[in-house]
Amino acid sequence: MPATPLNAPENATKQRSAAAPSISVGGQWIVDASGCDSKTLQSLSTIQSVCQDVIAALELKVIGDPPAHVFGPPHGVTALYLLSESHLAVHTYPEHGVATFNLVCCRETAVWDWQSQLQSRLSAAHVRIRHLRRGAWAEAGDEVNE
């Protein structure tokens, strides 16, 4: 009986396992909130308050003065927080009722309640949270909710 080639489908798992890193280098949270109140999404102070609460609750450390830009009605705001653990970026699109958050952290952290916080503070109708473990390819993506 001939040997199965290494690139055969039945050997794909073995190849991925052998090549996969054995260490996690933190995580990434990709959060999309939709059906949000458009006026709230234009408020830089509200968006900064949400970001500051995420940072405080997860005990992250901000480096420098976080840049932010208000695009002006009908558009939203963008804010970027450089963290000693990586970064937090937020972009709002009031014309679509959408806010997007991206938090990358080089260490494991507690879980922040994105769902209820964004529903309460941005009047989000839907919040989608995706968590990726960085560096751990075998567990590259975890859907937290839809």
Language model features with spans:
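Polybasic/polar functional segments that serve as interface/processing modules
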Residues: 1-146
